[in-house]
């Protein structure tokens, strides 16, 4: 008989698979998942330079953002694994063939659309309301975000600058914004962490990614269970 969490996760299977991890690795997975959030997410729209998208994914991993949304309406490319430094294994990458599809999907999930842009009507970073779930959109290197994103944005955001340079690389902008909003979020009473079920699902998924022979281990687990 299997023991499930909310009808989804076989707890005994999870514990069995994790027994093949080192205690340090199993503990690290749990520790990192305690810092993960879906309260904020990031969307990159048709970024031309592949390393920029990869660097944004890496920043999401560093600052605990679990989901990234990649729009490839014009520029269809694979994720640069070298630049992401393995982050693509631990961050969920959601791909879209159009900007409209991405915006609709995020709005349906209750996210505020925040467009990063130097427009005059944009707010500064310190004024972001971190209590609301938000999807931060980053655009193409030269053109920035499309009119569709700007028209559908609930708010617009810019990073204050005082030098001759008027813009930052999108991966740098993403890192600055994510560091600020996630740090500010953790100081609040907002329930920003993953649910218990989401953590269990990720523990199982991450364990499989670490253990090369996980398919054989799972098959053996069910064979042993049937013999009982």
Language model features with spans:
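Post-transcriptional modification and biogenesis factors for structured RNAs
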Residues: 1-228
